[in-house]
Amino acid sequence: MATVSMRDMLKAGVHFGHQTRYWNPKMKPFIFGARNRVHIINLEKTVPMFNEALAELAKVGEKKGKVLFVGTKRAASEAVKEAAIASNQFYVNNRWLGGMLTNYKTVRQSIKRLKELEIQSQDGTFDKLTKKEALMRTREMEKLEKSLGGIKDMGGLPDALFVIDADHEHIAIKEANNLGIPVYAVVDTNSNPDGVDYIIPGNDDAIRAVQLYLNAAASAVTEGRNKDVAVVAEKDGFVEAE
């Protein structure tokens, strides 16, 4: 079972919050104190909260649920994509387009267009076009891939959101709240924890910390999915034994 220890978190700098003047008072229960005008997050709270979140993510994986990893700022972007791909899940790592969840019908149309363009680029259609027209379609395809590439095979709304930086991704969280989709989020000392179902109090800027959260989340989802496979195999075994 994927778990993270206090030592792992200390090494990754999870305990370093933001400068005290930027704090959100709603994060007070998760703050240990301050050092050099920087808030220190209480890892005694973070460790069990994160491990509880991982256990729940494993359950989502076991039910073959879809997890959407969200992190669009530079420190998280690449790691978000890697975690989603490693766990066979989905991601938004460039820009959250308003309505990505709440207006999914429109998003679905854009995904359809992206897939059409991908086929055209491979089946020789682009070669039959004028250079200008081919270039325009290539640019359109690249633009759509950048914003929707991580969700083009999601095939519907996700069952959970795993968010890096609740403050930066507040629109995504609000949309998930409106649709009743559970939100797992890393919440730093400057962020509002409201609307987050599974709060992970921690540093949302340090790349090592961001990778720690994402690697653990990806492992939990994968373990859950594999557990389901093992159970099915076991059941099949019993059937054969009869």
From Swiss-Prot:
Domain of life of the organism encoding this protein: Bacteria
Residues annotated as signal peptide: none
Record PROSITE patterns: RIBOSOMAL_S2_1, RIBOSOMAL_S2_2
Keyword Ribosomal protein attributed: yes
Entry-linked InterPro entries: Ribosomal_uS2, Ribosomal_uS2_bac/mit/plastid, Ribosomal_uS2_CS, Ribosomal_uS2_flav_dom_sf
Keywords annotated in UniProt: Ribonucleoprotein, Ribosomal protein
Biological process terms in GO annotation: translation
UniProt GO molecular function: structural constituent of ribosome
Entry GO CC: cytosolic small ribosomal subunit
Family: Belongs to the universal ribosomal protein uS2 family.
Matching NCBIfam families: rpsB_bact
Family matches, as PANTHER family: 30S RIBOSOMAL PROTEIN S2 PROKARYOTIC AND ORGANELLAR, SMALL RIBOSOMAL SUBUNIT PROTEIN US2M
Protein name: Small ribosomal subunit protein uS2
